[in-house]
């Protein structure tokens, strides 16, 4: 987890943090990042004989639950008090107090 900014949170087994720029990942307090989640802060874009990279930060608020095998892509902010269902792929920001799931992840309902 070298470089990842992480509060008082649970990190499950086999979680993968982007090794290129782990400093671009921030996790708040009281989160559960469960087994085999992947947090990616960059994409590789093939351009003929070379590759371009696109980078972005991932910010996860407080009291967030990421179900097993969830993928968070670059440039995503997840608010406070959020649940993301297992196996979801999160490609856009999630506001506070919501439940999201699916591929790609989509709004399910408000979370009180």
For the regions a language model picked out, list residue spans one by one:
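Hydrophobic beta-strand core residues of beta-sandwich domains
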Residues: 4-6, 60, 78, 94
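A generic structural motif
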Residues: 22, 95-96
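Extended, small-residue-rich solenoid/repeat segments and analogous flexible loops
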Residues: 1-16
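Flexible, glycine/small-residue-enriched loop-and-beta-strand segment within the central core
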Residues: 12-77, 103-104, 109-112
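Acidic, glycine-centered active-site loop in nucleotide-sugar glycosyltransferases
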Residues: 96, 101-104
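Beta-rich strand-turn-strand
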Residues: 68-92, 98
């Amino acid at each position: 987890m070298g470089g990842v900014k992480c509060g008082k949170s649970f990190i499950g087994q086999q979680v993968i943090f982007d090794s290129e720029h782990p400093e671009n990942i921030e996790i708040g307090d009281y989160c559960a990042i469960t087994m085999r989640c992947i947090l990616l802060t960059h994409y590789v874009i093939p351009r003929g004989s070379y590759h371009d990279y696109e980078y972005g930060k991932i910010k996860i608020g407080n009291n967030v639950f990421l179900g097993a095998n969830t993928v968070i892509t670059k440039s995503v902010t997840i608010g406070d008090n959020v649940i993301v269902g297992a196996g979801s792929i999160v490609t856009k920001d999630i506001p506070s107090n919501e439940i999201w799931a699916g591929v790609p992840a989509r709004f399910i309902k408000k979370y009180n």
